[in-house]
């Protein structure tokens, strides 16, 4: 070992996924092309429709979030991935907003997750 490397320390840093909802967003009245590009049902009333998207860790949490969403509001599951923690729901704007809020509340209050606010566009 040369002198220039003698005083260097090698640090290995690992991250562990925590219990967290990192993203929760409602897209009110999205353009029909967004439905098509996401592979969602394009046969909806676009005037009052919405898409809700969430991301969470650990990724299996998306299964629980899906269950809460369908039991709490009149929404449809567009996509739920237990490997990435992504959940996409569709429905009326009020139902999608309410479902995301119900999920956030349950994960924060019951499961003690760190959660974000629900944002809207």
Locations of the language-model features?
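Positively charged, small/polar-rich N-terminal and surface patches that mediate targeting and assembly
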Residues: 1-66, 70-83, 90-121
């Amino acid at each position: 070992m040369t002198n220039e490397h003698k005083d260097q320390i090698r640090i290995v840093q690992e991250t562990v996924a925590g219990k967290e909802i990192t993203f929760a967003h409602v897209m009110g009245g999205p353009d029909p092309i967004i439905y098509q590009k996401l592979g969602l049902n394009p046969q909806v009333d676009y005037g009052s429709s919405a898409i809700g998207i969430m991301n969470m860790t650990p990724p299996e949490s998306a299964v629980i979030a899906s269950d809460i969403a369908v039991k709490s509001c009149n929404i449809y599951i567009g996509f739920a991935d237990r490997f990435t923690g992504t959940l996409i729901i569709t429905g009326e704007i009020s139902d999608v907003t309410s479902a995301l809020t119900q999920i956030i509340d349950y994960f924060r209050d019951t499961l003690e997750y760190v959660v974000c606010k629900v944002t809207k566009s």
